[in-house]
Amino acid sequence: MNSIASISAIDVHGHYGVYIQADKTPIYNQMMTGDADEVVRRAAAVNVGLTIVSPLLALLPRFKANAAVGNEEAARIVAQTPGLKHYVVIDPKRPETYAQADEMLRQPQCVGIKLHPEEHGYPIREHAALLFEFAAARKAIVLTHSSEQNSLCEDFVPWANRFPEVRLILAHIGCGWDGDVTHQVRAIQKCQHGNVFADTSSARSIMPNLIEWAVSQIGAERVLFGTDTPLYSTAMQRARIDHADLPDTDKRLILRDNAVRLFGSQLD
């Protein structure tokens, strides 16, 4: 095992559960499905020691998910599954998820907040004030889907600048509703406090030079390893970083050290 493959990686963007989208075929939905044990098995096979998940039950089907029920399931499942931590999902259209998040963020298995404006069907700009106020009061880490039309990266920038207590992870480097692969990186360049990061969980990661370009623009310190497991292959996402055209010092930051610095003792 080479020196990079020997690093026990931390995946900051995973899921578990049943994938359900009405516009997809049954075989497609089946292929995107994986329970907690399967997520851990795939991670362990490529030396990913910890995966931070949100439950698909809290996100899907699109516009119909009950985030509160999904959060309750995650608290139970993750507590009994070594190798996992979880985010609590807030859906601002379901006010009860704020109170639920307040309680769950005090629990050792819950390390942050997950937002998904696309699956829950709301423009982030209409709810960002309350979401960021809530997260700032708790000095919470927030992982959000980006950059489709309800979750434009540029719409997060003023709030990240206004609330430096919030550490924000923009998911899916290279994702863009308009085909532009630069949204996450450009948003980070506009942020003033060093409190915004991006993860590698996009399917766009397979593009040659995308991850390398992102590092050249914002530094490896702002890039976190994510897989979007079980939707995408953990092994493929791990290999993309292991074999990136980057110095080993940068790979180590992306795979592990940045997450350790960001989440700290919450990962214990």
Model-derived regions, located:
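Histidine-centered divalent metal-coordination motifs
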Residues: 10-17, 116, 145, 172
